[in-house]
């Protein structure tokens, strides 16, 4: 497994070279937790032993574990625990473990065996939802529905795009019945961000303008909660997604106007994604900015915008070196050379 830069990161993982809307996916997954050190007490009663051996920590601790590339280690614990915990005798704990299993499989899908791991994630989330009903556990229900929607959206990038996106929309709609802006602002914002990404993905196969406009509306809803002052990383994620969406919309109408909006959105993201704090997010966003300036050069101020594009690509290459990120290095270098030739 590749080592990550020893810099502070946002937790945002990119989906390889897939859709640009796969930004903030992992942070959009809700409700993960990690099991701490397993201490074995021999009391003769197996269930008592398991219950006393389990130590659940916070979502932040789970994120830190996964940030250390310990996804498979976490999954091993979840799987062992779920095989011992009774869904009947301790339903809530069982559902928590299944939800966390789903998060692990989702994250593993970013690394390997994409389709197989996404299908395992879906199965785990569906198992959790047998217990996490809207009536008994409304918040947990919404969390897992959001996770399920995100996973179906990811699966749509692999196969059966329309079919899986339909399932994603259904899951997000269920989550938003619980996650209202007034009562659950963070869940509302996360789900709106994910909903926007789903509409953007759908725009690739049908009703491009209409679905991109729906995506923009959803991202703007998310930004009503995800302000830079209160939730800077969520703000940056959604602004970057918004910038990508405006760039896509520029291919349909008002090219100059929508590209200008894209520039502004991406620049907002870069107020948070700095080179020192979030190098990978910085590089990805600088690459996006370079692409926007390259497109804008086709409309106005050709030399000026191409120069800005080259500078943005050069910034991205401060992170995307040939030795550490060869595929990104080659892609960004090719875009930069093209911009230089067009000047």
Residue locations for each model-derived region?
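Hydrophobic, helix-forming membrane-interacting segments
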Residues: 8-48
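Charged/polar helix/coil "stalk" or linker segments at domain boundaries
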Residues: 42-116, 158, 162, 209
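Flexible helix-coil transition and linker loops at the boundaries of alpha-helical arrays
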Residues: 47-49, 82-94, 111, 129-141, ...
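Conserved alpha-helical positions within TPR/SEL1-like repeat arrays
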Residues: 59-67, 93-110, 139-154, 186-204, ...
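Short coil/turn connectors between adjacent alpha-helices in alpha-solenoid helical repeat scaffolds
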Residues: 62-73, 106-119, 153-167, 200-214, ...
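Conserved positions within tandem-repeat grammars
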Residues: 116, 127, 139-142, 163-166, ...
